Amino acid sequence: MDLTLTRSGTVKDPINLVSDGHITVHQLHVLADHVIIQGFTVVGGGELLLAGTGIVAQKNTVHDTQRGGIICASCTDSIIESNTVTHAATTGISISGQRITVRENLVSETVAGGDGDADGVRFFGNGLRIISNSIQDISVKGSPAALHPDCFQTFDTGHSATFDVDIIGNACRNVAENCLIATGDESGNSEAPAGVRSITFIGNDCVTDGDQAVNLRRWPNVDVRKNHLLGPNLKRAVLITNGSTHSTVRDNITRSDVAAVKIDDSSRPGFNSPF
């Protein structure tokens, strides 16, 4: 069964789309404003797709989908909270828009999808809060060699500016490549307001299998502090390249035999670090 809702509620009287926990659907699409979605199981087909203002998706289970897990596309003032996403294609949770909170979700076993990649959370837009989520067990199996399963990923190719993003207090375990990767290969995220922090990455617990835990390429104004950045294959905890200027790297914990940060000359302007 496919379920689609296009009728909106209001701020004072939202629509409650609530399951008792025993309703299973092939895909669930909510293209409306001021809707609460709770307790559904989405399995085997499309995604839980959200688009609108004032949407809350909580305590849903999404697994073995073909087009992603939970996708909040063009959302505003919305919350994705306490959901479980397992074995989704391409990305467990993807958000795009303004003032979206992703909190206390469990994402695991994302597999390579249409673009060949497999990620925990992808994020695009501004005013985003990604807090206290657990992402785990995303392997390189099935992904083309050039691609990289990551916990948190953003990029500017085909997207408007991403800034004012807080990624705080998350756990990232047994993921094949990066804990955080931000790449500005199209424009260097140049549409972001000058001098505004793009990403604040604080207090996260990362145990990944890549060469670095944090990878910034042509992506300025990132604050990386007070994280555990660990993994068996680390060559450096943080890699900053290609004009990723005005970044901060401080007070992170990593292995004693691993460089805390590797930064190229083009990224050194405005760099704030004790190293």
Q: What are these model-predicted stretches?
A:
Residues D2-Q38:
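Beta-solenoid repeat scaffold
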Residues D2-T4, T24-Q27, G44-L49, D64-C72, ...:
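Extracellular beta-strand/beta-solenoid scaffold signature
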Residues H29-Q66, D77-T86, R103, I168:
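Parallel beta-helix/beta-solenoid
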Residues D33, T53-I55, C75-D77, Q98-T101, ...:
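Short "repeat-start/strand-capping" segments in structured domains, especially the N-termini
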Residues D166, A171-C172, N178:
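Oxyanion-binding "anion nests"
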Residues R225, K235-F275:
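Acidic, glycine- and Ser/Thr-rich low-complexity intrinsically disordered tracts
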